[in-house]
Amino acid sequence: MKYSIETYKDNIALINVDNEKGLKATLVSFGAGVYELSFNDHPVILTLKEIDDYLYSSQYYGKTLGTVAGRLKKDGLIDGNEYHLIPESGQNFALHGGMLKSISYKNWDYKIKESNKKLDVIFSITTRNNEGGYPGKVRIYVTYSFLKDKDEFKIFYKATTPSDAVFCNLSNHMYFNFDTHDISDYYLKMNVDQVAITEPNLLIIDKEKVPAHLDFNKAAKLNKRMDYIEKHDFKKTIDDTFIFSSMPGKITLQNADVKLDITTDCSSLNIYVDNSLTPINFKAHDDYSLRRGIALEPQRFILNKDEIILHKGEVYKNYIDYKFKAR
């Protein structure tokens, strides 16, 4: 296992990890995120060409999401006390902890621990009370754990609070693409039985049985599902939250060359397929097609408020495990 640290501007750290087997990553202290990830010398996530673009992109490429991943209604109650979030422009919700103001856009502290079996990069940050309208303080730890003898890494989430009650729901926003122009020929499989019902602005209000065009309990090719969605769904893409039918949650994404298996103890999974051609410069390709990447974001189901409320004396914990295999 090898690693090196580069210092970018404003004390932002780039941490390069190589397990000397096939997996390489560049982590960034700003947003506690994954800037680059490669398997057998091929990129497996979308990486912006310039670090500066990564830092402040509104698409959250590879960053930690929080303090609340997903859309949380801007006004409501937490343990009987009112809260008032700063919403997205023209909306009645805050997304991923607040656009350009959340932990995704802050520089985290970090430390590195190495043993004979693994390398841990541990990021930490403490939020301020009422930051973005979110009540209370949260101490958050995000650990990227790389194994020396396997093409596998895990993300461990941990959080505590000195406040009476806070919201907490953490995830990661890597966009997967296994060095191809798009993901149309990829197969997706996952053990889910319900999907969120949303308002037109995608704020979750209920859940229902997974409809046929979103059923991935058996491996299904993404292009077939996306063709249907583009014709019949106003979103023109997959931007949905699924509830796992059993624990752990299991997701498999594969094409002809690479298989990615994800397991998690999170109760739900948000999937977002980037089906746009916004003018962004990427590192691996400059001619990506539509359907250029898929974000797989395990998280707690935001409609179940008890899952995302953390009290003083409690410890928030979740994990996501990523395993890569050549086909």
Show where each model-derived region lies:
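An exposed, glycine/acidic-rich loop-and-rim segment of catalytic or binding clefts
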Residues: 1-327
